[in-house]
Amino acid sequence: MSDEIVTNKSVTYVNNTTPVTITXSELDLRSCYQDDEVVIEVHAAALNPIDFITHQLCNSYIFGKYPKTYSRDYSGVIIKAGKDVDNRWKVGDKVNGMYSHIYGERGTLTHYLILNPAKDIPITHMVEVPKDENDPYDDFVYAAAWPLTFGTAFSTLYDFKKDWTSDSKVLVIGASTSVSYAFVHIAKNYFNIGTVVGICSKNSIERNKKLGYDYLVPYDEGSIVENVKKLKQIVLENDKFDMIXDSVGNHDFFPVIDQFLKPKAKNSFYVTIAGNNKANYKNISWRDFVSLSSILKAINPFKKYNWRFGHPYPPNNFIEVGNEMIKKGTYKPPIDSVYEFDQYKEAIDRLMSNRAKGKVVVKMK
Protein backbone atom coordinates (compact mmCIF):
# COMPACT_ATOMS: atom_id res chain seq x y z
CA MET A 1 0.00 0.00 0.00
CA SER A 2 1.26 3.48 -0.87
CA ASP A 3 2.29 5.77 2.00
CA GLU A 4 -0.33 8.16 0.63
CA ILE A 5 -3.13 5.71 1.38
CA VAL A 6 -3.90 5.65 5.09
CA THR A 7 -6.50 4.21 7.43
CA ASN A 8 -8.48 6.98 9.06
CA LYS A 9 -9.89 5.95 12.43
CA SER A 10 -12.73 8.00 13.91
CA VAL A 11 -15.00 7.84 16.96
CA THR A 12 -18.53 7.67 15.58
CA TYR A 13 -22.14 6.71 16.23
CA VAL A 14 -25.16 6.26 13.96
CA ASN A 15 -28.08 7.27 16.18
CA ASN A 16 -29.20 7.30 19.81
CA THR A 17 -29.71 3.53 19.84
CA THR A 18 -26.14 2.74 18.76
CA PRO A 19 -23.07 2.99 20.99
CA VAL A 20 -20.11 5.17 20.21
CA THR A 21 -17.38 3.14 18.54
CA ILE A 22 -14.21 3.38 16.44
CA THR A 23 -14.78 3.08 12.71
CA UNK A 24 -12.08 2.96 10.05
CA SER A 25 -12.03 4.08 6.43
CA GLU A 26 -9.39 4.16 3.74
CA LEU A 27 -8.20 7.65 2.83
CA ASP A 28 -6.13 8.46 -0.25
CA LEU A 29 -4.16 11.55 0.74
CA ARG A 30 -3.51 12.33 -2.93
CA SER A 31 -7.15 12.86 -3.80
CA CYS A 32 -9.29 13.13 -0.64
CA TYR A 33 -9.41 16.93 -0.60
CA GLN A 34 -10.67 19.69 -2.91
CA ASP A 35 -8.62 22.58 -4.28
CA ASP A 36 -9.87 24.86 -1.49
CA GLU A 37 -9.34 22.35 1.34
CA VAL A 38 -6.55 21.24 3.65
CA VAL A 39 -5.93 17.89 5.31
CA ILE A 40 -5.02 18.13 8.99
CA GLU A 41 -3.38 15.25 10.81
CA VAL A 42 -5.12 15.61 14.15
CA HIS A 43 -2.95 15.36 17.25
CA ALA A 44 -5.61 16.05 19.90
CA ALA A 45 -9.33 16.75 20.23
CA ALA A 46 -11.38 17.90 23.21
CA LEU A 47 -14.74 16.57 24.29
CA ASN A 48 -17.66 18.89 25.06
CA PRO A 49 -21.16 18.20 26.39
CA ILE A 50 -22.56 18.98 22.94
CA ASP A 51 -20.97 15.71 21.74
CA PHE A 52 -23.03 13.33 23.84
CA ILE A 53 -26.04 15.64 23.87
CA THR A 54 -26.31 15.42 20.08
CA HIS A 55 -25.65 11.67 20.26
CA GLN A 56 -28.51 11.07 22.69
CA LEU A 57 -30.88 13.29 20.70
CA CYS A 58 -30.07 11.66 17.35
CA ASN A 59 -33.20 10.01 15.99
CA SER A 60 -32.36 7.84 12.98
CA TYR A 61 -35.62 8.66 11.20
CA ILE A 62 -34.76 12.35 11.27
CA PHE A 63 -30.97 12.43 11.06
CA GLY A 64 -30.19 9.44 8.87
CA LYS A 65 -28.27 6.20 9.32
CA TYR A 66 -24.76 7.31 8.34
CA PRO A 67 -21.85 7.40 10.84
CA LYS A 68 -21.54 10.72 12.67
CA THR A 69 -18.20 11.74 14.15
CA TYR A 70 -17.63 13.10 17.65
CA SER A 71 -16.05 16.41 18.64
CA ARG A 72 -15.41 19.92 17.39
CA ASP A 73 -12.21 21.21 19.03
CA TYR A 74 -8.93 20.08 17.47
CA SER A 75 -5.22 20.67 17.08
CA GLY A 76 -2.88 19.19 14.52
CA VAL A 77 -0.58 19.69 11.54
CA ILE A 78 -1.54 20.52 7.95
CA ILE A 79 -0.20 17.72 5.74
CA LYS A 80 -1.97 18.59 2.46
CA ALA A 81 -3.22 21.87 0.98
CA GLY A 82 -5.21 22.43 -2.21
CA LYS A 83 -3.92 24.81 -4.87
CA ASP A 84 -6.59 27.43 -4.13
CA VAL A 85 -6.00 27.57 -0.38
CA ASP A 86 -4.79 30.94 0.92
CA ASN A 87 -1.02 30.82 1.32
CA ARG A 88 -1.24 31.65 5.02
CA TRP A 89 -2.10 27.93 5.44
CA LYS A 90 0.88 25.80 4.46
CA VAL A 91 1.90 22.17 4.77
CA GLY A 92 3.68 21.76 8.09
CA ASP A 93 1.72 24.49 9.90
CA LYS A 94 0.54 23.67 13.41
CA VAL A 95 -3.09 24.73 13.69
CA ASN A 96 -6.06 24.52 16.02
CA GLY A 97 -9.67 25.56 15.90
CA MET A 98 -13.30 24.59 16.15
CA TYR A 99 -14.90 22.55 13.36
CA SER A 100 -18.60 23.36 13.62
CA HIS A 101 -21.11 20.64 12.83
CA ILE A 102 -24.19 19.06 14.34
CA TYR A 103 -24.46 15.61 12.75
CA GLY A 104 -21.47 15.69 10.46
CA GLU A 105 -19.73 12.72 8.92
CA ARG A 106 -16.63 14.78 9.60
CA GLY A 107 -15.75 15.59 13.19
CA THR A 108 -12.52 16.12 15.07
CA LEU A 109 -12.23 12.90 17.08
CA THR A 110 -10.46 11.42 14.09
CA HIS A 111 -6.92 11.01 12.80
CA TYR A 112 -7.39 13.09 9.64
CA LEU A 113 -9.68 16.11 9.31
CA ILE A 114 -10.46 17.65 5.93
CA LEU A 115 -11.79 21.22 5.95
CA ASN A 116 -11.95 24.50 4.06
CA PRO A 117 -9.99 27.05 6.13
CA ALA A 118 -11.85 29.95 4.52
CA LYS A 119 -15.25 28.59 5.56
CA ASP A 120 -14.72 26.19 8.45
CA ILE A 121 -13.81 28.87 10.94
CA PRO A 122 -12.41 29.48 13.40
CA ILE A 123 -8.98 28.11 12.58
CA THR A 124 -5.70 29.65 13.69
CA HIS A 125 -2.02 28.92 14.01
CA MET A 126 -1.16 27.41 17.35
CA VAL A 127 0.60 29.55 19.93
CA GLU A 128 2.92 28.27 22.61
CA VAL A 129 1.38 28.04 26.06
CA PRO A 130 3.61 29.35 28.87
CA LYS A 131 4.46 26.29 30.96
CA ASP A 132 6.62 25.40 33.92
CA GLU A 133 9.11 22.55 33.76
CA ASN A 134 6.74 20.12 35.48
CA ASP A 135 3.85 20.72 33.10
CA PRO A 136 2.71 17.28 31.85
CA TYR A 137 0.94 18.47 28.69
CA ASP A 138 2.23 19.54 25.29
CA ASP A 139 1.01 22.45 23.18
CA PHE A 140 -1.25 20.22 21.06
CA VAL A 141 -3.21 19.19 24.16
CA TYR A 142 -3.62 22.79 25.28
CA ALA A 143 -4.47 23.98 21.76
CA ALA A 144 -7.31 21.48 21.45
CA ALA A 145 -8.72 22.36 24.85
CA TRP A 146 -10.02 25.89 24.44
CA PRO A 147 -11.72 27.06 21.20
CA LEU A 148 -15.33 26.06 21.91
CA THR A 149 -15.44 26.96 25.60
CA PHE A 150 -13.45 30.16 25.16
CA GLY A 151 -15.57 31.13 22.16
CA THR A 152 -18.78 30.56 24.10
CA ALA A 153 -17.57 32.68 27.00
CA PHE A 154 -16.23 35.46 24.79
CA SER A 155 -19.40 35.58 22.69
CA THR A 156 -21.52 35.83 25.85
CA LEU A 157 -19.61 38.91 26.96
CA TYR A 158 -19.03 40.49 23.55
CA ASP A 159 -22.11 39.87 21.45
CA PHE A 160 -24.85 41.13 23.76
CA LYS A 161 -23.47 43.93 25.92
CA LYS A 162 -20.95 46.42 24.53
CA ASP A 163 -20.44 48.89 27.37
CA TRP A 164 -18.40 47.05 30.00
CA THR A 165 -16.57 49.21 32.55
CA SER A 166 -14.72 48.87 35.83
CA ASP A 167 -18.05 49.56 37.54
CA SER A 168 -19.81 46.62 35.83
CA LYS A 169 -20.95 43.64 37.86
CA VAL A 170 -21.55 40.08 36.65
CA LEU A 171 -22.99 37.02 38.39
CA VAL A 172 -21.79 33.63 37.10
CA ILE A 173 -23.94 30.59 37.88
CA GLY A 174 -21.70 27.53 37.67
CA ALA A 175 -18.33 29.09 38.41
CA SER A 176 -16.44 25.78 38.09
CA THR A 177 -17.26 24.91 34.47
CA SER A 178 -14.72 25.29 31.67
CA VAL A 179 -16.86 27.98 30.04
CA SER A 180 -16.98 29.92 33.32
CA TYR A 181 -13.21 29.47 33.72
CA ALA A 182 -12.75 31.22 30.38
CA PHE A 183 -15.52 33.71 31.22
CA VAL A 184 -13.88 35.05 34.39
CA HIS A 185 -10.47 35.35 32.72
CA ILE A 186 -11.95 37.23 29.75
CA ALA A 187 -14.12 39.41 31.99
CA LYS A 188 -11.25 40.47 34.24
CA ASN A 189 -8.32 40.53 31.79
CA TYR A 190 -9.88 41.58 28.48
CA PHE A 191 -13.02 43.58 29.30
CA ASN A 192 -11.70 44.84 32.67
CA ILE A 193 -15.01 44.19 34.40
CA GLY A 194 -14.87 45.40 37.98
CA THR A 195 -16.80 42.74 39.88
CA VAL A 196 -17.39 39.09 38.99
CA VAL A 197 -19.32 36.96 41.48
CA GLY A 198 -19.37 33.18 41.09
CA ILE A 199 -21.70 30.49 42.40
CA CYS A 200 -20.16 27.07 43.04
CA SER A 201 -20.04 24.26 45.60
CA LYS A 202 -18.42 25.01 48.95
CA ASN A 203 -15.66 22.52 48.10
CA SER A 204 -14.74 24.48 44.95
CA ILE A 205 -14.47 27.92 46.52
CA GLU A 206 -10.74 27.77 47.26
CA ARG A 207 -9.97 26.57 43.73
CA ASN A 208 -12.11 29.26 42.14
CA LYS A 209 -10.69 32.07 44.26
CA LYS A 210 -7.45 31.63 42.33
CA LEU A 211 -9.19 32.15 38.97
CA GLY A 212 -10.06 35.80 39.51
CA TYR A 213 -13.57 35.81 40.96
CA ASP A 214 -14.02 38.74 43.31
CA TYR A 215 -16.57 36.89 45.43
CA LEU A 216 -17.86 33.32 45.58
CA VAL A 217 -21.17 32.06 46.93
CA PRO A 218 -21.84 28.37 47.74
CA TYR A 219 -24.95 26.76 46.29
CA ASP A 220 -24.89 23.90 48.80
CA GLU A 221 -25.08 25.92 52.01
CA GLY A 222 -28.59 27.31 52.27
CA SER A 223 -30.53 29.12 49.55
CA ILE A 224 -28.60 30.30 46.49
CA VAL A 225 -30.87 33.29 46.08
CA GLU A 226 -30.62 34.30 49.73
CA ASN A 227 -26.84 33.87 49.77
CA VAL A 228 -26.41 36.11 46.73
CA LYS A 229 -28.90 38.58 48.16
CA LYS A 230 -26.86 38.89 51.36
CA LEU A 231 -23.67 39.45 49.37
CA LYS A 232 -25.39 42.07 47.25
CA GLN A 233 -26.69 43.95 50.29
CA ILE A 234 -23.59 43.76 52.48
CA VAL A 235 -20.69 43.86 50.01
CA LEU A 236 -22.06 45.30 46.76
CA GLU A 237 -24.00 48.12 48.41
CA ASN A 238 -27.19 46.61 46.99
CA ASP A 239 -26.08 47.31 43.43
CA LYS A 240 -27.60 44.99 40.83
CA PHE A 241 -25.84 42.97 38.14
CA ASP A 242 -25.29 44.01 34.53
CA MET A 243 -25.33 40.36 33.47
CA ILE A 244 -26.20 36.99 34.92
CA UNK A 245 -24.42 34.23 33.01
CA ASP A 246 -25.59 30.67 33.56
CA SER A 247 -23.37 27.81 32.41
CA VAL A 248 -25.10 24.93 34.19
CA GLY A 249 -28.88 25.36 33.78
CA ASN A 250 -30.67 27.21 36.57
CA HIS A 251 -34.00 28.95 37.12
CA ASP A 252 -33.79 30.02 40.77
CA PHE A 253 -33.47 33.73 40.06
CA PHE A 254 -36.33 34.13 37.58
CA PRO A 255 -39.10 34.76 40.16
CA VAL A 256 -37.05 37.57 41.72
CA ILE A 257 -34.99 38.64 38.73
CA ASP A 258 -35.80 42.33 39.24
CA GLN A 259 -33.98 42.19 42.59
CA PHE A 260 -30.72 41.06 41.00
CA LEU A 261 -30.55 42.18 37.35
CA LYS A 262 -30.48 45.82 36.34
CA PRO A 263 -33.47 47.09 34.33
CA LYS A 264 -33.75 46.11 30.69
CA ALA A 265 -33.34 49.77 29.70
CA LYS A 266 -29.79 49.70 31.10
CA ASN A 267 -28.77 47.03 28.59
CA SER A 268 -28.57 44.22 31.12
CA PHE A 269 -28.74 40.55 30.09
CA TYR A 270 -29.50 37.10 31.43
CA VAL A 271 -27.53 34.69 29.23
CA THR A 272 -27.67 30.91 29.52
CA ILE A 273 -25.71 28.29 27.60
CA ALA A 274 -27.52 25.36 29.21
CA GLY A 275 -31.24 26.15 29.32
CA ASN A 276 -33.27 26.67 32.46
CA ASN A 277 -32.60 23.31 34.13
CA LYS A 278 -29.46 21.33 34.85
CA ALA A 279 -29.29 18.51 32.33
CA ASN A 280 -28.80 14.86 33.24
CA TYR A 281 -26.20 13.98 30.63
CA LYS A 282 -27.00 10.28 30.92
CA ASN A 283 -30.65 10.84 30.05
CA ILE A 284 -30.97 13.84 27.74
CA SER A 285 -34.25 14.90 26.15
CA TRP A 286 -35.19 17.77 23.85
CA ARG A 287 -37.23 19.24 26.72
CA ASP A 288 -34.00 20.01 28.56
CA PHE A 289 -33.16 22.61 25.92
CA VAL A 290 -36.36 23.47 24.08
CA SER A 291 -38.77 23.84 26.97
CA LEU A 292 -41.88 25.98 26.75
CA SER A 293 -40.49 28.31 29.40
CA SER A 294 -37.29 28.82 27.39
CA ILE A 295 -39.26 29.60 24.25
CA LEU A 296 -41.46 32.07 26.11
CA LYS A 297 -38.45 33.78 27.64
CA ALA A 298 -36.87 34.11 24.22
CA ILE A 299 -39.88 35.49 22.34
CA ASN A 300 -41.98 37.20 25.02
CA PRO A 301 -41.92 40.92 24.14
CA PHE A 302 -43.36 41.86 27.54
CA LYS A 303 -40.66 40.38 29.77
CA LYS A 304 -38.81 42.97 31.82
CA TYR A 305 -35.31 41.72 31.09
CA ASN A 306 -33.18 40.62 28.14
CA TRP A 307 -32.86 36.82 27.95
CA ARG A 308 -30.49 35.19 25.47
CA PHE A 309 -29.10 31.75 24.67
CA GLY A 310 -25.32 31.97 24.35
CA HIS A 311 -23.16 30.13 21.82
CA PRO A 312 -19.76 30.62 20.16
CA TYR A 313 -19.86 33.02 17.23
CA PRO A 314 -16.71 32.60 15.08
CA PRO A 315 -16.93 35.90 13.13
CA ASN A 316 -16.35 37.92 16.31
CA ASN A 317 -12.64 37.00 16.21
CA PHE A 318 -12.59 35.21 19.55
CA ILE A 319 -9.90 32.84 18.31
CA GLU A 320 -7.39 35.68 17.96
CA VAL A 321 -8.34 37.12 21.35
CA GLY A 322 -7.71 33.70 22.85
CA ASN A 323 -4.31 33.47 21.20
CA GLU A 324 -3.29 36.87 22.54
CA MET A 325 -4.42 36.06 26.07
CA ILE A 326 -2.59 32.72 26.00
CA LYS A 327 0.64 34.39 24.83
CA LYS A 328 0.34 37.04 27.55
CA GLY A 329 -0.30 34.42 30.20
CA THR A 330 -3.71 35.86 31.11
CA TYR A 331 -5.51 32.65 30.07
CA LYS A 332 -4.25 29.08 30.22
CA PRO A 333 -6.65 26.37 29.04
CA PRO A 334 -7.61 24.19 32.02
CA ILE A 335 -6.95 20.46 31.58
CA ASP A 336 -8.79 17.90 33.70
CA SER A 337 -7.47 14.74 32.06
CA VAL A 338 -5.94 13.38 28.86
CA TYR A 339 -6.74 10.01 27.28
CA GLU A 340 -5.29 8.01 24.42
CA PHE A 341 -7.48 7.50 21.35
CA ASP A 342 -8.47 3.94 22.26
CA GLN A 343 -9.56 5.18 25.71
CA TYR A 344 -12.33 7.32 24.21
CA LYS A 345 -15.02 5.59 26.29
CA GLU A 346 -13.24 6.46 29.53
CA ALA A 347 -12.88 10.04 28.30
CA ILE A 348 -16.60 10.31 27.56
CA ASP A 349 -17.46 8.78 30.94
CA ARG A 350 -15.22 11.31 32.68
CA LEU A 351 -16.95 14.26 31.07
CA MET A 352 -20.41 12.81 31.67
CA SER A 353 -19.62 12.35 35.36
CA ASN A 354 -19.91 16.12 35.96
CA ARG A 355 -16.74 15.86 38.05
CA ALA A 356 -14.24 17.15 35.49
CA LYS A 357 -12.45 20.34 36.52
CA GLY A 358 -11.23 21.50 33.14
CA LYS A 359 -11.18 19.97 29.69
CA VAL A 360 -11.14 16.29 28.83
CA VAL A 361 -8.79 15.79 25.88
CA VAL A 362 -8.16 12.77 23.64
CA LYS A 363 -4.74 12.35 21.99
CA MET A 364 -4.24 10.80 18.59
CA LYS A 365 -0.45 11.25 18.52
UniProtKB/Swiss-Prot annotation:
Keywords: Lipid droplet, Mitochondrion. It holds the Pfam family ADH_N. Disulfide bonds: none annotated. Gene3D superfamilies: Medium-chain alcohol dehydrogenases, catalytic domain, NAD(P)-binding Rossmann-like Domain. The keyword Mitochondrion applies. One of its GO terms (cellular component) is mitochondrion. Coiled coil: none annotated. InterPro entries: ADH-like_N (IPR013154), GroES-like_sf (IPR011032), NAD(P)-bd_dom_sf (IPR036291), YIM1/Zinc_Alcohol_DH_Fams (IPR050700). Its main location: other. It is found in: Lipid droplet; Mitochondrion. Belongs to the YIM1 family. PANTHER family: ALCOHOL DEHYDROGENASE RELATED, RETICULON-4-INTERACTING PROTEIN 1, MITOCHONDRIAL. This is Protein YIM1. It comes from Saccharomyces cerevisiae (strain FostersO) (Baker's yeast). The lineage of its organism: Eukaryota, Fungi, Dikarya, Ascomycota, Saccharomycotina. The gene is YIM1.
